[in-house]
A protein has these predicted regions:
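Short His-Asn-centered micro-motif
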Residues: 11-12, 32, 76-78
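C-terminal segments that line or cap access tunnels to active or ligand-binding sites in enzymes
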Residues: 71-78, 82-300
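Rossmann-like flavin
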Residues: 1-14, 22
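Acidic carboxylate-rich catalytic motifs and surrounding loops in phosphoryl-/glycosyl-chemistry enzymes
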Residues: 11, 34-39, 242-246
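Acidic, proline/serine/threonine- and glycine-rich low-complexity intrinsically disordered segments
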Residues: 16-20, 26-28, 33
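Core beta-strand elements of the Rossmann-like FAD/NAD(P) dinucleotide-binding domain
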Residues: 61-73
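A conserved short coil-to-beta-strand element within the FAD-binding core of flavoproteins
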Residues: 31-61
């Protein structure tokens, strides 16, 4: 499947052919709104005036288009809390990529919102990744050497097939504000039965650690594991050996993961069906819905 980019035309006289000018050809995710007043009086949508007219498609590097009518439905996931996320490895930090590039959910939302305030204000959420980023890491234990320290805290054996931590364990005095959790094991069908998966995350990625004296965002997976081992009580003379040989740790940096928690006012997120729209709607954490849920319980795709 190729990437699909949506574009709305500002008025019905504007050329509808893909690449009507070179700027549009270079920015196929341009999304413009048509203010259509041409519907016949008495038509079901005669008073509505925002209509999605066309979806430009790039598939196998070839441009194409899907023409739309008022009977079609277009669903838009605007923004995106995991956009620009990156993975590291045991020996490599996860990159901190904050630049929002053309083609992503934030770029598309900005282009939509620039045409009508009814489409919200994306920069309320994505203007400062220093306020919205945090990191997670998956620690896979490779033998039994770390397990006793886990048992000592959660008072449960992670290999019984039952609940392990029963929730999040937060290290309150951690400079990174580290937390960790272990779900019912095994988590994956092909996971070795004697391996345990631990999810570690921290909110302050710019602060030096308590054991590893560097910010989490600059740490390899091994170094993040060392910081976690320190906080679960592993003797300092064993920490590096266990992080190197008894675990494999994969870090993930998410620059916009907390974007939906940024201060906002009513109207900063568009309604699911904005006033006056005919055939398109917004979905996800950045659409205004009554009694919505957020963060790991939401419905965005």
């Amino acid at each position: 499947m190729g990437k699909r980019f949506a574009r709305m035309l500002r008025d019905k006289e504007q050329p509808t052919a893909y690449g009507a000018d070179q700027r549009q050809r270079n920015e196929p995710n341009k999304f413009q709104v048509a203010y259509l007043g041409s519907l016949e009086p008495g038509h079901a949508h005669a008073t509505a005036h925002k209509l999605a007219k066309r979806i430009d498609v790039i598939e196998n590097n070839e441009p194409g288009a899907i023409d739309l009518t008022e009977n079609d439905l277009v669903f838009i996931t605007n923004g995106g809390c995991v956009e620009n996320s990156s993975m590291g490895s045991q020996d490599k930090p996860a990159a901190y990529n904050t630049e929002l590039k053309p083609g992503g959910g934030w770029d598309m939302w900005r282009k939509i919102a620039a045409q009508d305030p009814v489409f919200g204000h994306p920069d309320k959420f994505c203007h400062d990744p220093e306020q919205t980023n945090w990191m997670s890491a998956t620690v896979e234990t490779l033998d039994q050497k770390i397990i006793p320290y886990i048992k000592n805290i959660c008072k449960r054996d992670p290999f019984t097939g039952h609940v392990v931590t029963g929730g999040i364990v937060t290290v309150k005095d951690s400079s990174w504000l580290m937390s960790w959790t272990i779900n019912r094991q095994p988590q994956f069908r092909d996971q070795p039965k004697d391996h345990c998966l631990v999810w570690v995350y921290s909110l302050f990625t710019d602060k030096p650690g308590d054991y590893v004296k560097k910010p989490m965002r600059a740490c390899t997976g091994k170094e993040i594991c060392m910081e976690w081992l320190y906080h679960i009580g592993v003797p300092e003379n064993q920490i590096e050996d266990l992080a190197s040989n008894s675990a494999n740790t994969v870090p993930v940096m998410m620059p916009y993961i907390d974007a939906f928690f940024m201060p906002r006012a009513y109207g900063d997120r568009p309604k699911v069906v904005p006033d006056g729209t005919v055939n398109f709607a917004f979905l996800g954490q950045f659409a205004e819905t009554p009694r919505d849920t957020i963060f790991t319980t939401e419905y965005s795709m």
